[in-house]
Amino acid sequence: MTSTNHANRHHDARATVIIGAAFLSLCAAWMSVLPLFAGPDEPANFIKSAAVVRGEMVGSPIDASATTSFWSTYVDIDSRFGTAQQVPWCFVGQPQVPACDKPLSTLTAVEESRTDMGRYPALGFLPAGLGTLVGPSDIGARAARLTAAL
């Protein structure tokens, strides 16, 4: 191997690391300014991720109704994770209202933790689930976003 080839490979690897770090930094910045649970299905994903990392792969089925679907299940985890479902209702269906910021710690669980992602394949939720090990809190939700991005 010539020294030129070695230098080119080193330069390519360095550029790849720099681009990857820049992209991860951009993702982290975006995740830190986007209000929690403002993304579509983010509460359901947060709850499913918390369940998967704690060994609850599917949960107990719920009959489909006006507010649930075939995919909905109750999961046997701390009910405080389920409070994430309450956050978006201050702006859903109200296009003129910006996303609100209700800290999870201020909400009271009204039912078992329910996720509309209950029957989705569990493996994809594992990375975000690692972030939920911080707990059912705003910091836990942000950690779940970050570990999902990795």
Regions found by a protein language model. Give the residues of each.
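Interfacial juxtamembrane loops and adjacent helix segments
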Residues: 56-142
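Start-transfer (signal-anchor) and selected internal transmembrane alpha helices
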Residues: 1-28
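Helix-to-loop transition at the C-terminal end of transmembrane segments
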Residues: 29-43
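Conserved aromatic-histidine-acidic binding/catalytic patches
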Residues: 9, 13, 34-37, 115-119, ...
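Selective detector of the "anchor" transmembrane alpha-helix that sits immediately C-terminal
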Residues: 140-150
